[in-house]
Amino acid sequence: MKNPSELKDLLSELEEKGGGYFVDFVTTKGIQAGIMRLHPCEIDAQEPHSADEVYYVIEGNGFINLNYKNHPIKQGTSIFVQAGSEHRFHGNTRDLLIFYALGK
């Protein structure tokens, strides 16, 4: 973990991973935080988590399906997802870049 982390470095790390769509920059006993990037038509395959989550849209737009209801999202949108809730990002027509943080 590099502290502080720069967005350009995290995006480079995503490119180097070749296949992943998220990268953590903080992983401790109490918190996990990072960025995720979804290309258009890429599938968000995450499962519900056992901890509450917060998302913030850095750039892009699309939808989040939260508990089987679609909500539009765009740059500047913040989203709270309660532990155990079904959620998926989808419908973006350009790259969707999102900050996330969740308890552990």
In which residue ranges do the predicted regions lie?
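A short, N-terminal "cap"/entry segment at the start of jelly-roll beta-barrel domains
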Residues: 1-35, 45
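Surface-exposed loop/turn positions
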Residues: 29-31, 42, 77, 85
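Short beta-strand/loop turn elements enriched in aromatics
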Residues: 30, 40-51, 104
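A generic "binding-loop/recognition-motif" signal
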Residues: 31, 50, 69, 85, ...
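Short, conserved beta-strand element in jelly-roll/cupin
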Residues: 38, 49-64
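Short, surface-exposed secondary-structure edge patches
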Residues: 45, 54, 68-71
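Short acidic-glycine-tyrosine-enriched beta hairpin
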Residues: 68-83
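Ligand-binding loop in jelly-roll beta-barrel domains
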Residues: 83-104
